[in-house]
Amino acid sequence: MTAAFYDLMDFDEVLEKYDPVMGLEVHVELATETKMFSASSAHFGAAPNSNVDPVSLGLPGALPVVNAKGVEWAIKIGLALNCSIAESSRFARKNYFYPDQPKNYQISQYDEPIAYDGYLDVMLEDGTEWRIEIERAHMEEDTGKLTHLGGTSGRIHGATASLVDCNRAGVPLIEIVTKPIEGAGARAPEIAKAYVSALRDLVKALGVSDGRLDQGSMRVDANLSLRPIGQEEFGTRTETKNINSLKSVEQAITFEMQRQAHVLDNGGTIDQETRHYQETDGTTSKGRPKETAEDYRYFNDPDLPPVIAPAEWVEEIRATLPELPWVRRARIQEEWKLSDAEMRDLVNANALDLIIETVEAGTTPDEARAWWVSYLSQKANETGVELEALPVTPAHVARVVALIKEGKLTNKLGRQAIDGVLAGEGDVDAVVASRGLEVVRDDGAIEAAVDEALAANPDIVEKYRAGNTKVTGAIVGAVMKATRGKADPAQVNKLIAEKLA
């Protein structure tokens, strides 16, 4: 199904009539060694149902024990988000039935979260800042993962069978919930994307999660409602679930604004429901009616005591906070002498961390920027993935730069080496060897190619000797073609100048 099958209002017309109100819920999987309430491994990628135990399977008599590292990291996230930390918080049971929830309830936090009343300032594409108010950040356990078979959508509707993998059940989660984001207008999609990007940078800097949207270690639920311009009361919201890329966050918000506006403008009503985001065409589809908190029948978990976080412990954790992303950006901008516009370009391309790591691997800032912001960003756009999801690491880029400096690769050959890494042909040195990319050092072969190119272009030789020294580009191009791009351009230019002197 494509967007053409939906009746949508033009985006500019939406803004003339309606005010969007957003609320974002971001689930962050913590990279602890073990699960939140048991000793099973929490590592991603194991064989299905191999990281399980009586607690995560909900077997009778199994009792949970709180992962202290998970609590510490939850406090660390709360502090970085400028939240107040509760001296005493409690776990609650969120009751619902679904095949990926073996216990038929999820251990979460309800009215006594670990962190509350915070904010995160995010940078927009033009360099302005927008403050996102944080309602709460609470601890909970993740669910299992369902794989639906036999349908066309990959979802449960239309499937003939579903497989359950409980490896993820019980993995520590922090759910970060914003307060309603009002007054964003046309920038609502951009603000949502910037917030998720900033939050991802934050949890990565804290070392508590890899923030991989594509692998599900960070998942976004986007709530959106519209209200007529000037109305105080919020409209009915929808919740688009499990959005897994920055681009998708922006597209999902945009689509829901246009879809809801068309429904309202034609006398319809918005159902309070979940929606599924469709990666293929940027649309959302109907899910299920959205429950209220009362439907989950929360009550304090009788198997778990309150979580006590004395002020002294909180301050000890605060002292361990690393340099936070916005502080690092300011430092890097000053050290690298970047303009505001240059820094915005790096942030907007989500390239800053990759560039910093490439510099740490041995390049200059300018060399690293040239690769990540131009060539590799282009490759990411062509394949429709985030820059960091490319199978190229800062170490790969640093190695290519080193080989270019050593004269073993040209820039063109370096790009071919990166293409090989992207294609899964191995690391840089393996690709250079297998593709035969190293610069030709046979002076005789290069000189012969220069002689042949000069003989084939007498008119250029005549113009050069008449004083127009800028015409040698065609000669250089012919030599590079003859050597399959493996000649050193500096050496070629030197030989041409010597022969035409």
Curated annotation (Swiss-Prot):
GO terms for molecular function: asparaginyl-tRNA synthase (glutamine-hydrolyzing) activity; ATP binding; glutaminyl-tRNA synthase (glutamine-hydrolyzing) activity. This is Aspartyl/glutamyl-tRNA(Asn/Gln) amidotransferase subunit B. PROSITE patterns: GATB (PS01234). Its EC number is 6.3.5.-. The keyword Protein biosynthesis applies. InterPro entries: Asn/Gln-tRNA_amidoTrfase_suB/E, Asn/Gln-tRNA_Trfase_suB/E_cat, Asn/Gln_amidotransferase, Asn/Gln_tRNA_amidoTrase-B-like, GatB, GatB_Yqey_C_2, Gln-tRNA_amidoTrfase_suB_CS, Gln_synth/guanido_kin_cat_dom. Heterotrimer of A, B and C subunits.
